[in-house]
Amino acid sequence: MSIPFPSAPADKEALENAGLFSPKFDAHGLVTAVVTDARDGELLMVAHMNAEALSLTLETGIAHYYSRSRDKIWKKGETSGNLQTVKEFRTDCDQDAVWLKVSVAGHDATCHTGRRSCFYRTVELSNGDAVTKITDDTRHFDPATTYSNT
């Protein structure tokens, strides 16, 4: 079953107040999804959701996203066992982005690299170049083993 999301109201006040969830999809039919750990607030990932992913997430309580590179719905953690159970689902004032507070099953890892968060690097300026530096290299699972059959 797919939830019929209404178009965003033209009235800004109606959009910003409580009422029907009416996501404002971009030209590609997507909204940005920010995902944090419900337990400690750590930023885990940023992804995109289309109407189907939003519906599946709301209906099942398990996070689903839209993969732009694979052009399909993706149930986060389906292969690795690190499913994301949604504890709280929020939207911003314009309803063009959502924030999922999740608990992560399995290895408690969100990133396909095996790390807890996709944000495991800092960006710094070094000798005039922007460079990345790994700040969390703890691997919670081995991606080569986990994704060997995908």
Curated annotation (Swiss-Prot):
- Primary location recorded for the protein, binned into one broad class: cytoplasm
Q: What is its EC number?
A: 3.5.4.19
Keyword entries, A-Z: Amino-acid biosynthesis, Cytoplasm, Histidine biosynthesis, Hydrolase, Magnesium, Metal-binding, Zinc
Q: Which GO terms describe its biological process?
A: L-histidine biosynthetic process
Kindly list the GO molecular function terms attached to this UniProt entry: magnesium ion binding; phosphoribosyl-AMP cyclohydrolase activity; zinc ion binding
Pfam families given for it? PRA-CH (PF01502)
- Cofactor requirement: Mg(2+); Zn(2+)
Q: Which residues bind Zn(2+)?
A: 93, 111, 118
Gene Ontology CC terms, in alphabetical order: cytoplasm
Q: How is the cofactor bound?
A: Binds 1 Mg(2+) ion per subunit. Binds 1 zinc ion per subunit.
Q: Where in the cell is it found?
A: Cytoplasm
Which pathway or pathways does this protein act in?
A: Amino-acid biosynthesis; L-histidine biosynthesis; L-histidine from 5-phospho-alpha-D-ribose 1-diphosphate: step 3/9
Q: Which residue ranges traverse the bilayer?
A: none
The UniProt record gives the binding positions of Mg(2+) as 92, 94, 96
Catalytic activity line of the entry: 1-(5-phospho-beta-D-ribosyl)-5'-AMP + H2O = 1-(5-phospho-beta-D-ribosyl)-5-[(5-phospho-beta-D-ribosylamino)methylideneamino]imidazole-4-carboxamide
User: What family does the database annotate?
Assistant: Belongs to the PRA-CH family.
Q: What does this protein do?
A: Catalyzes the hydrolysis of the adenine ring of phosphoribosyl-AMP.
Q: How does it assemble?
A: Homodimer.
Q: Which PANTHER family match?
A: HISTIDINE BIOSYNTHESIS BIFUNCTIONAL PROTEIN, HISTIDINE BIOSYNTHESIS BIFUNCTIONAL PROTEIN HIS7
Q: What is this protein called?
A: Phosphoribosyl-AMP cyclohydrolase
Q: Which gene encodes it?
A: hisI
